[in-house]
């Protein structure tokens, strides 16, 4: 009915001679995985002849968290140079932001376009 359990604690310095039931192993230290910095992607906004400048500023404020002044500067770069970088993100975040901007622009009936490009 009753099981008996024997617990034996031994320490290497206390034991003068090895016993036949002892087992010796290798001490393994876990190494931390080497993490690489993920590649970054630019979200690029392209100019068109139909989207109002105020809408572009609104999009930059809403989806890229830019303040009014910086959003206006990016909008003017898009307007004068034909394109501008709205931000740098990891691939998943960049794809999501570009998709959100494109979807929001379509819902508001504007042809505004964002795409992603690998940095470097």
UniProtKB/Swiss-Prot annotation:
InterPro entries: ClpS (IPR022935), ClpS_core (IPR003769), Ribosomal_bL12_C/ClpS-like (IPR014719). SUPFAM superfamilies: ClpS-like. It comes from the Bacteria. One of its GO terms (biological process) is protein catabolic process. PANTHER family: ATP-DEPENDENT CLP PROTEASE ADAPTER PROTEIN CLPS, ATP-DEPENDENT CLP PROTEASE ADAPTER PROTEIN CLPS1, CHLOROPLASTIC. Binds to the N-terminal domain of the chaperone ClpA. Involved in the modulation of the specificity of the ClpAP-mediated ATP-dependent protein degradation. Belongs to the ClpS family. This is ATP-dependent Clp protease adapter protein ClpS. The lineage of its organism: Bacteria, Pseudomonadati, Pseudomonadota, Gammaproteobacteria, Pseudomonadales.
């Amino acid at each position: 009915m009753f099981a008996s359990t024997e617990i034996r604690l031994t320490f290497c310095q206390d034991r003068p001679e090895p016993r036949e039931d002892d087992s010796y192993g290798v001490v393994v230290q876990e190494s931390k995985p080497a993490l690489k910095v993920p590649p970054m992607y630019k979200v690029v906004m392209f100019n068109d002849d139909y989207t109002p400048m105020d809408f572009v500023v609104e999009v930059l404020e809403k989806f890229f968290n830019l303040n009014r002044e910086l959003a206006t500067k990016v909008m003017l770069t898009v307007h004068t140079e034909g394109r501008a970088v709205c931000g740098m993100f990891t691939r998943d975040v960049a794809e999501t932001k570009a998709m959100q901007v494109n979807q929001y622009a379509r819902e508001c009936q504007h042809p505004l376009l964002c795409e992603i490009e690998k940095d470097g």
